[in-house]
Amino acid sequence: MRGVTLSRSGARRTAIAGGAAATTLLALWAHPPLAGAQSPAAERATAQAIRNIGGERALRNLSSFRLRSTGRTWIFDEGPQPGNSVTPASTFRLTMDYDLRSSGDRVRADYVRNSLGTDRPVSEVIAGRRGFISGVDANGSPAGDKAMTSDRWAAVLREQRLLNPHLILRDVMANPRLATIFPSRSLNGRPHRVLLVRDAVDPLRLYIDARTGRIDRLTTGDHNDNRGDVRTIVDYTGWRSAGSGMRFPRTVTLKQEGQTLHSETRSAVRANAPVSSTRFRFPAGVNATYDRALASRGARTTEWLMTFAHLGFVKDGPATEIAPRVVAPGSTLIQGIPNQSMIVEQQDGIVVVEGALSSPRAEALIAYIRRSFPNKPIRYVTGSHHHADHSGGMRPFVALGARPVVHEVAIPFYQRVFGNKSSRLLRDRLDTSDADANILGVPATGIVTLPDPLRPVQLLAERTEHASTTVLVFVPREGVLFVNGDTYTPGAPAGPGARTLDQTIRANNLAVSWIVGGHGGVVSYAQFQQALAVAPAS
C-alpha cells in the first residue's frame, strides 16, 4: 500500500500484530469479503494517520500499552425527568493494561468506580474470547469473582477500540482493504480527511487533520433499546508521547445524541510496558464461556451496557430466563433476572405489567405468554416509570398490538420511543411493524381502569423523587399491587419511599393484600406494615 510500504517480512509481522483484533472482533461477527485494493487517497490518509500516532514501524512493534486515567461517566434515561438529558453514572480511576496478541488480545482494566458515594474497586479482565470480573461490580454487592458474560466482553473491547484508535489502525495496517476514503469534512474550522473503516458493528469514520495528520474525531453507531440507533462521537485531544515512538491522546470524550457519556484524562500512558501473564490468570472456580450471539448484541449496545456497569446496576447477560411465581390467581410475577414483570390474565386478554429492560427480555416474555395463555391477545403493556431498565422492553408488545399505558408526563418520551422504526444495528418487532402506539396516559390524580369482566386492572400515579413518571398497577380482585421496585423494593428494609407508598395506598383506599415490584420479592400487606413499623423515622 502506497505511503505505508511494508517489506515481505514486515507485512507478515503486521498481519500477526493485527490478527488479535481480527480474532476478537472482526472474525467473530463475519462480514462478506472485501473486494479491490485500497485507493491512493485512502492510502495517503491511512499513512498520514499512522505517521501521526508514531509511524508504521512503531505501530507494527506495539505489543502492549498501559494507561492511568481518571474520568466521569453519564447515563441516558435514569434521571427524575424524561427527555434527552443525561445524569451522572460514576466517577472513576483506572489503570489498564492492554496486551496485543495474535491469539486474542488480553485486557485488564482495574477500576475504582464511585456511583453512590462509595468506592467500588472492580477489575474487568479479558483473555482472548473469555473474561472475568473481580471485585465489587454492583452497588451493595460483596467483593467476589465471576465469569464475564459475552455481551460485557464485547462491550469492553469495543469501547476500548473507540477510545484508542491505534487498535483500529493496527487492523487497517494488517488489511488495508478495510479502509476507504470518504468525502472530506471541516471540523473546528479545519479541513479533515475522513477515513472510512469497515467494522464488525458499524463503519468507523476517522477524522484526520489534513495539515497535521492528527486524528481528532471518530464517529460510528451504537444501539439503545429505547432510542434506537444512536450516533457515537469520540473526540481526541492533547496527543503526547507514550514512549517507543508512539503517541496517545491525553483526553478522550465520547458522546451520543449530543450528550457526553464518557470523559477521561490520561495522567500516564506507556507503550510496550511489560505485562505479566499473572494479571490475566482466571481465579479458581471461574469458568467463562463464549456466546457468539450475546457478544454480537453486546458490541451493538456498548454504551448502554457500560454506562449501567459504571452506575453499578449491571445489566449483563442473556436476560431470557423466565421464573414464574404465582402471587395470586391471575397474577404471576416473572422473575429470573433483577428486572421483573408481572403477567395479569384477564378474561379477554393479557396485561403485561412492566415491559422491562430490552427487546430480548420482551421476546422471552412473549414466548412464555404464548405457551401459558394460548390464543389470548396481549392487550396492554405498562411502564412503572421511564427509566431505561424499566421501559426498554415495551416496543415488541406495541408491535403485537398492545396498548401502552404510562404516566401522562411520559407520553412525549414514549411517542419518540415507539415512533422510531429505523434501527439497522438491532432491529426489533416494531422496526418491521406498521403498528401505531395508541398511548393511554395515567393522570397525576385519579385512577385509570383497564376494563375486563373478570379481572380489571387499575393504574394510578405515585409521587416520587425517583421519577416524575411513576405509576402503580393494582389488581383489585385479588389485591395485588405492583410497584416500581426502586423507591420501595418488596422484601427489603422500608425507607422513605415505603412511607410515601403507604400514604398513596391509604389516600386511594386500595385494598392491598400483596405487594410485588420491578425488583424484589413478594410481601403481604401485613409484612409491609411490619417493615414500616421498625423502619427509622424519616
For each feature predicted by the language model, list its residue ranges.
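Bacterial N-terminal signal peptides that target proteins for export
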Residues: 2-22, 29-30
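Flexible, processing/modification-adjacent segments and terminal tails
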Residues: 38-44, 51, 117-119, 125-204, ...
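Zn-dependent metallo-beta-lactamase
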Residues: 268-347
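Conserved beta-strand hairpin/beta-sheet module of binuclear metal-dependent hydrolase folds
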Residues: 325-371, 470-488
